[in-house]
Curated annotation (Swiss-Prot):
Single biological process term from Gene Ontology: DNA synthesis involved in DNA repair
Chain segments annotated as coiled-coil in the UniProt record: none
Superkingdom, natural source: Bacteria
Keywords from the named record: ATP-binding, Cytoplasm, DNA damage, DNA repair, DNA replication, DNA-binding, Nucleotide-binding, SOS response
UniProt-recorded name of the protein: DNA replication and repair protein RecF
Origin species: Azotobacter vinelandii
Binding site for ATP: 43-50
Upper classification of the organism: Bacteria, Pseudomonadati, Pseudomonadota, Gammaproteobacteria, Pseudomonadales
MF-aspect GO terms: ATP binding; single-stranded DNA binding
Alphabetical list of HAMAP family matching this protein: RecF
Sequence similarity: Belongs to the RecF family.
SUPFAM superfamilies the UniProt entry points to: P-loop containing nucleoside triphosphate hydrolases
Subcellular location as annotated: Cytoplasm
């Protein structure tokens, strides 16, 4: 298993500067008992790549438990009550932010930012915007509407400051409304209160529509078409956006590689929006060659280089991504094999690999 780390060059166009790092410490997560790695994190999970993404994603937000399961148990090491992840984000302007997340098997979550306890995972996500591109991400166009709603919500969350309060109030109104429906008919007083709150949330959503349109259409060749409205039967929690080509859905008329490429471009478009908002976004790209051919892989490398962001990419075939970058792009290569992480020289055949990390606490 190989991993590429694309360093972040200086924005002014001069020679590459030292990229912002995200050093991390891991305590009793699955496959790793205790580890401290600077710049790049990896550990074995079958092939050895996914535990790295578990831990780095946790530094951004506890948005998932496992890439293969929605349960929490696959993340926590066997016979351990909890797992803990620490991260340190170093920004280009010299600011340092310390992040910490701990969660036990009962589901209790503790988040600390700069030594202070925080209650909302949104504060953690705001501290480190992170985009994940993996085989599941390629189903953005053909998956359930919930996937596309989450995609748009992520972009607006990092661009529009008004989004989170409006979204929270809308979710509260929907929970109250659903609770009333489960207990029978809604009395006129409760119905009027709920309608008034939903109308306010509709007003907020109209103000945020411009942000959603930028997330869905900017930097793309074809726009999305909203197929939902605020009436019955489609309500805001049932909203969806689909893309049409010659009045036909792409999932029925386009090749799989084309659909995957459109999904990737949507992710890249969100990176541009975050960048315009003066934020830093990190990309985690898992098993890229499995979904994109050589032409599209090279195109993705160019798009990532234009973003000037920090990127972590894994692949099984070293040659599949070795030639994708420009010669002036700083790239670090890591090889993972049986809990041993080595850093071979770019362009070498792997005979003189220098070990960079070998922890006896990692369990194969």
């Amino acid at each position: 298993m190989y991993g590429f780390r694309l360093c972040r060059p200086c924005r002014c166009g001069c020679k590459p500067a030292t990229p912002p790092r995200c050093p991390s410490a891991v305590t009793v997560t699955r496959c790793v008992t205790s580890a401290r790695v600077n710049q790049y994190i990896s550990g074995p999970n079958g092939s050895g790549k996914r535990p790295a993404y578990w831990r780095r994603s946790t530094c951004s937000a506890w948005q998932l438990s496992s890439f293969r399961s929605q349960r929490l148990s696959p993340v926590i090491q066997h016979e351990q009550p909890a797992c803990t992840v620490f991260g340190q984000v170093l920004w280009n302007d010299g600011r340092v932010r310390n992040l910490g997340v701990a969660r036990n098997r009962l589901g209790e979550l503790q988040i600390r930012i700069d030594g202070q306890n925080v209650r909302s995972a949104a504060q953690l996500a705001e501290s480190l915007p992170l985009q994940l591109i993996n085989p599941d991400s390629f189903r953005l166009l053909e998956g359930a509407p919930k996937v596309r709603r989450q995609f748009l919500d992520w972009g607006v969350f990092h661009v529009e400051q008004r989004f989170l309060p409006a979204w929270d109030r809308l979710q509260t109104a929907l929970r109250q409304r659903n609770s009333w429906l489960r207990h029978g008919r809604i009395d006129p007083v409760s119905q009027a209160a709920w309608d008034r709150e939903l109308c306010l949330r509709r007003s907020d959503s109209e103000l945020l529509r411009a942000g959603r349109e930028r997330c869905s259409a900017r930097f793309l060749l074809l726009p999305f078409r909203a197929i939902s409205n605020w009436g019955i039967p489609r309500r805001p929690q049932r909203a969806d956006r689909r893309r049409r080509l010659a009045r036909t859905m792409p999932r029925t008329c386009c090749r799989a590689v084309t659909r995957s490429w459109w999904s990737v471009r949507l992710k890249i478009a969100q990176g541009h929006l975050v960048d315009r908002a003066r934020r830093e976004c990190i990309y985690l790209v898992d098993d890229l060659p499995s979904e994109l051919d050589e032409q599209h892989r090279r195109a993705l490398c160019r798009l990532l280089e234009e973003l000037h962001c920090q990127v972590f990419i894994t692949c099984v075939d070293l040659e599949a991504l070795r030639e994708g970058w420009r010669t002036d792009t700083p790239v670090a290569l890591f090889h993972v094999n049986r809990a041993l992480i080595t850093q071979p020289t770019i362009g070498s055949e792997g005979n003189d690999r220098k070990p960079t990390y070998d922890s006896s606490s990692i369990k194969s």
